[in-house]
Design a protein with these regions (language model features):
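Active-site-adjacent structural patch at catalytic or cofactor/ligand-binding sites
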Residues: 18
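Surface-exposed interaction regions that form or flank ligand-binding interfaces
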Residues: 1, 8-10, 21-26, 32-125
Length: 125
């Protein structure tokens, strides 16, 4: 799983990419999910929880920001409804386009980018 941060006027998108193949089942509150594919069944840690851990770390660095979580599945078929933050890669543009209200002004946007680029621990006002 790889995480990416997209800083925009609409919020700070925190994307966790899941490059899994097969059918994924479970529930959004389960600690582990089941991945079935090619005759093999395996368990993975719930990527929604992993995404939340990444947001928690960013909150410590950036302070209170409008974080928008998303877990993006590149190849898997989702068997269950994992909620609106579980997105197949083909739905990603639609996911982004759903955010239309500006929540971060230009100055704070630049500050967020500077903090992430410099690796400083300055909290935002």
């Amino acid at each position: 799983q790889i995480s990416h941060v997209v800083v925009s006027p609409y919020g700070v998108f925190v994307l966790t990419l899941c490059d899994l193949r097969g059918k994924i089942s479970g529930h959004r509150d389960d600690q582990e999910w089941i991945v079935k594919g090619r005759g093999v069944s395996d368990t993975i840690l719930n990527p929604l929880w992993e995404n939340r851990k990444h947001i928690n770390a960013l909150e410590k660095k950036l302070g209170s920001q409008p974080f928008i979580p998303a877990v993006v599945f590149t190849h898997a078929k989702l068997i269950n409804d994992f909620g609106p933050i579980a997105v197949c890669v083909g739905q990603l543009q639609k996911f982004f386009m759903g955010y239309t209200r500006r929540l971060i002004d230009h100055d704070d946007l630049e500050l967020v980018v500077d903090i992430l680029n410099e690796g400083t621990d300055r909290p935002l006002p």
